[in-house]
Amino acid sequence: MAQKKLTTMLSILSDRFIEKQIPFCLIGAFALGFYGLSRHTVDIDFMVDANYGDPALEILTGSGYTCFQKTELFAQFDSEYDVFGKVDMMFASTDAGREMIRRSVLLDAELIGRVPVVQPTDYIILKLLAIANDKERLPKDEFDISEFFKGYRTFGISEKFEKIDAKRIYRFAEKFGQTGLIQKYMATEK
């Protein structure tokens, strides 16, 4: 039942962001499902252009969420009594982050409606960024990277998305000091 509520809220929030012309995309575990891979999740993760942060916050608070943490880089929301689940919002304040939003694929899913989904290459780059910014995230995010590549090699990725861009991933991995980490999983993608 919790997953159904999250899916419903994803649909509602995505519609409202699109209606207000807020540049955003879905990131995190929900994105994996659109690639044809899956992982259980208890929250919805968005990346939003930082220039549209205030209108995005208004949409969330107007949709029954309370912001319990906000910085220049992200905001976290919870719904009263956890009825709608949690939402994490990353603010894209760099050209690279905004480019990820522009590169996202607008999908029209039967149960969810329209939602822009981050490219798989950018999903990996965001995981590397998370590790670079917070070493305590290493076990969880490295596991996610490992599982992504296992699924990618076994099942492939929906053809709606671009193929993995190894050069792009390595460029960001080097920038984030994560080349050694990503080499473990991308040896065959180089």
Per-region residue spans from a language model:
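Compositionally biased terminal segments of proteins
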Residues: 1-190
